[in-house]
Amino acid sequence: MKTIILFLTLLVISSSCTSIITKTMNSKETTYLDSPAVSPSIDQYLVDIHLGHSFLQGVMSFCYDCGKACFRRGKNLARCKKFVCRCTKSGIK
């Protein structure tokens, strides 16, 4: 009886430790899509932004992503039409 209780106790402790370890490892590997690019100077001068899209995504979702991409570059959204995203040349004022 004592061995069963000891075994179950060790099993619970080891499973809780592994869950804590995997939780911390997964949180370190998380990357965020809204974070700015590593080298923003490369695409800073681009006016047209080519985002990957699909027809299942829809125009509204594409234009939302277009506006977010312009904002990350410090530009205003000029036009989003027929899956073409255009930002203003001047920065946000």
From Swiss-Prot:
GO terms for cellular component: extracellular region; filiform apparatus. It is found in: Secreted. Residues 1-19 form the signal peptide. Keywords: Antimicrobial, Disulfide bond, Fungicide, Plant defense, Secreted, Signal. Disulfide bonds join C63-C80, C66-C85, C70-C87. One of its GO terms (biological process) is killing of cells of another organism. Belongs to the DEFL family. This is Defensin-like protein 210. It comes from Arabidopsis thaliana.
